[in-house]
């Protein structure tokens, strides 16, 4: 039985030649189909307002992923909320922190990033203990947060 097609569960890359599957498919004479199998849908503005959370009451946002950044700024745009320049951000990793450049001007004193673990996030929270935090998470999140 010879394999002639491979399904990759990712969106098609913009430059196909830079894909790791390009060289493999050329070498083995295979067809590669790209199809994103996972679709992330953000919470609606109505659902967010039902939680009675005021974004502007918080001084620091904690982001765990790029999708939470997209959802946060989408909700702010839909609710016509202007995020103040004084807002600080704590991100899981440096890659997530750099993704914030899509929405804000990147300044090191406003953006902090952890090493990807819960303990490194706690260190950043303790460092900024006078701030009021808002944690943005995706719904099925890995529960490394302690119950409070």
Describe the predicted segments one by one:
Residues 1-148:
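Conserved beta-alpha
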């Amino acid at each position: 039985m010879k394999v002639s097609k491979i399904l990759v569960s990712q969106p098609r890359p913009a430059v196909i030649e830079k894909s790791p599957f390009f060289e493999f498919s050329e070498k083995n004479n295979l067809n590669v189909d790209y199809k994103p199998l996972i679709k992330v849908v953000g919470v609606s503005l109505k659902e967010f307002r039902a939680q009675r959370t005021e974004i502007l009451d918080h001084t620091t946002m904690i982001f765990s992923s790029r999708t939470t950044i997209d959802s946060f700024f989408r909700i702010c745009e839909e609710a016509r909320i202007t995020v103040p320049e004084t807002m600080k951000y704590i991100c899981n990793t440096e890659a997530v922190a750099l993704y914030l450049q899509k929405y804000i001007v990147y300044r090191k004193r406003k953006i902090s990033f952890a090493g990807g673990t819960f303990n490194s996030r706690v260190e950043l929270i303790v460092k900024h203990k006078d701030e009021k935090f808002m944690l943005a998470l995706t719904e099925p999140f890995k529960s490394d947060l302690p119950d409070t």
